[in-house]
């Protein structure tokens, strides 16, 4: 018969007592009172945070937006068709965040950073909050480097700098998205990461943009965040913040980023829908009172960081659609007041064949020539002045038939300058090409040509300088100054090409 050893038993009991770890897991839960239209009202969830993610019994995730005394208003990140009254909900203890990494480059994702391009999962080891605070005053420095768009009208007269917020505004079908995509194409080789956020767009329009970027090799440095028109309002509301979080990831790693929001007015409409369903009081145009804050907290995240933080930058180009050119509507005025200037696209100019249809008279950049290299400043000043005088004269000339020779010459020069601002889509120009184009126009070298010949001559001149006078581009790119040597090279090239062109035209 085995003997019972009391000391061994007591040791085992003592060990077990020492190893015992009393773990109490408290889960913050609630019950669904009502669900429908992408909104759920929950009883319970007493300690939930504003903006916290909550998980429903069947797996749908929601965001707690309304914290009321008797219930919590939750917006659903999905259709929520399987959620039933009385089903349980638990708080996750997490605020909305997304995974971030270099692997996102070249991919098309949704507002939850999940790939929607059918090319498999995206690996990531880090995450960022979808809504993080904008850099403070000390964390920023003033904008001083240009972000070239490749469009003469913008780079010469409405320059955009790295870290600036510049609004692109105009009626539908005036080429707003084309200006933004051309800017992305022009960043090739400039070490700029681009993020294109499509909010409430047609899926076919987004596919068109993605194809255009892929064909020209721009997807290598671009991320597309897309929520189509049929997406839940919650995801359309979140998409811009997801794009901003991805751009911030690169900005804080000392990189330069460009983010395009197309368009924030659709985000405001999604937010209005959510707010009205949550029974928040409506204000002007039925938008909630904090719709200004919706956009300001998004656009303030664009910045040029200080030297201490590595001088990374995030440049934002929000695109807003107007109705019949009315910029005094609620959302356009809000975004105009937040941004550092606006590029106004006119339907009249577009229909008159002036493309890009930029109305230079009412477009403005509040950063100005600080966002231009010295060479561009040297030639752009004269262009601005001559176009302003031309616009004034043109209006006056409509009421007068007998104009003196000087006025006729000035009108002829203005028409040719307006012609040189025209550009084909997806054909951005380098800074050197822009400088030679502007110099040719403002110094009267185009005056002898017919208006119909101007663009053809300029195209051939740019090719001629690129092949026969490569030193010109080297001087501009290395010194950033339009030196006397560069000027002499350009004058020779213009004369030589002019002679060649006139001979060809006679044949």
Curated annotation (Swiss-Prot):
GO terms for cellular component: chloroplast thylakoid membrane; proton-transporting ATP synthase complex. The record marks 363 as: Required for activity. It is a peripheral membrane protein. It is an enzyme of class 7 (translocase). Pfam families: ATP-synt_ab (PF00006), ATP-synt_ab_C (PF00306), ATP-synt_ab_N (PF02874). GO terms for molecular function: ADP binding; ATP binding; proton-transporting ATP synthase activity, rotational mechanism. It comes from the Eukaryota. Keywords: ATP synthesis, ATP-binding, CF(1), Chloroplast, Hydrogen ion transport, Ion transport, Membrane, Nucleotide-binding, Plastid, Thylakoid, Translocase, Transport. It catalyses: ATP + H2O + 4 H(+)(in) = ADP + phosphate + 5 H(+)(out). Its main location: plastid. F-type ATPases have 2 components, CF(1) - the catalytic core - and CF(0) - the membrane proton channel. CF(1) has five subunits: alpha(3), beta(3), gamma(1), delta(1), epsilon(1). CF(0) has four main subunits: a, b, b' and c. PANTHER family: ATP SYNTHASE SUBUNIT ALPHA, MITOCHONDRIAL (PTHR48082:SF2). Belongs to the ATPase alpha/beta chains family. Produces ATP from ADP in the presence of a proton gradient across the membrane. The alpha chain is a regulatory subunit. This is ATP synthase subunit alpha, chloroplastic. It comes from Oenothera glazioviana (Large-flowered evening primrose).
